[in-house]
Amino acid sequence: GLKDIFKAGLGSLVKNIAAHVAN
């Protein structure tokens, strides 16, 4: 549902931020 899409998007965003911080 919509919550799943939101969770997936949020998880992707967190991963991207974590990748930038790691670099």
Swiss-Prot record:
Membrane-spanning ranges: none
GO biological process: defense response to bacterium; innate immune response
Keyword Transport: no
GO annotation, cellular component aspect: extracellular region; membrane; other organism cell membrane
Keywords: Amidation, Amphibian defense peptide, Antibiotic, Antimicrobial, Immunity, Innate immunity, Membrane, Secreted, Target cell membrane, Target membrane
Keyword Ligase set for record: no
Tissue-specific expression: Expressed by the skin glands.
Main location: secreted
Similarity remark: Belongs to the frog skin active peptide (FSAP) family. Alyteserin-1 subfamily.
Task of the protein: Antibacterial peptide with amphipathic alpha-helical structure. Shows selective growth inhibitory activity against the Gram-negative bacteria E.coli (MIC=25 uM) Has a weak hemolytic activity against human erythrocytes (LC(50)>100 uM). Is very weakly active against S.aureus (MIC=200 uM).
Protein name, as recorded: Alyteserin-1d
Organism encoding this protein: Alytes obstetricans (Common midwife toad)
Phylogenetic placement of the source organism: Eukaryota, Metazoa, Chordata, Craniata, Vertebrata
